[in-house]
């Protein structure tokens, strides 16, 4: 954890990420933005999946110092901070940051694979609907339309859709957006199964002069 935190700090990746974040406070008693985002980053690096797990970081002063933080904030402070960032602002913040982290790995010809997988859901979650689900029939699910580098198995983007939006047409807009963001780093070939061989997806590719299989 400490070594990776030091890497993020030394390379400037964490600093750029914090500077671009749209989170802003007006109260003088509010936590520092760097402490909030640093806590989130340390939690992700530690493999935490729930806000409650953040408590385990409170005693790790070394990792916090590696990111230039004053302290690790509480789980409640982190939850409230992330709730302040609307979806449009978070997308404009995170997508360039994520793309910056992978662009240099795409300097050689590569293949973009498209795949859809069904994620069964338990409990109440937004977008959970009963749709095509061969492993758990009649179980609500999400559909994950995934775009990844074929040779590296490196995920570039995921379109999370409701359980009824399993057809390839629901990935068309996300595919076009990703290709536009890649610019001169576009794949030599876009590859998908027969479900993606429909007119809408093919027009999206041909309109950009993008080879496909």
Describe these PLM feature segments.
Residues 1-181, 205-208:
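Dynamic "connector" segments at or just before major functional cores
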Residues 211-213:
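Short hydrophobic alpha-helical runs that function as membrane-insertion/retention elements
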């Amino acid at each position: 954890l400490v070594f990776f935190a030091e890497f993020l700090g030394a390379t400037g990746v964490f600093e750029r990420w914090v500077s671009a974040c749209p989170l802003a406070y007006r109260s003088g008693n509010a936590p520092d933005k760097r402490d909030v985002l640093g806590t989130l980053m340390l939690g992700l690096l530690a493999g935490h999946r729930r806000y409650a797990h953040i408590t385990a970081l409170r005693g790790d002063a070394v990792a916090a110092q590696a990111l230039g933080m004053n302290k690790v904030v509480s789980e409640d402070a982190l939850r409230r901070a992330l709730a302040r960032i609307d979806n449009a602002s978070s997308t404009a913040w995170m997508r360039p940051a994520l793309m910056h982290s992978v662009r240099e790995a795409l300097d050689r010809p590569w293949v973009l694979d498209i795949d859809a997988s069904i994620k069964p859901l338990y409990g109440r979650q937004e977008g959970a609907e009963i749709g095509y689900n061969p492993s758990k029939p009649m179980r609500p699910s999400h559909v994950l339309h995934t775009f990844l580098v074929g040779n590296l198995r490196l995920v570039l983007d995921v379109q999370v859709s409701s359980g009824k939006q399993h057809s390839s047409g629901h990935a068309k807009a996300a595919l076009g957006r990703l290709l536009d963001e890649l610019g001169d780093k576009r794949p030599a070939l876009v590859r998908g199964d027969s479900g993606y061989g429909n007119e809408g997806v093919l027009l999206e590719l041909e309109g950009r002069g993008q080879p496909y299989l």
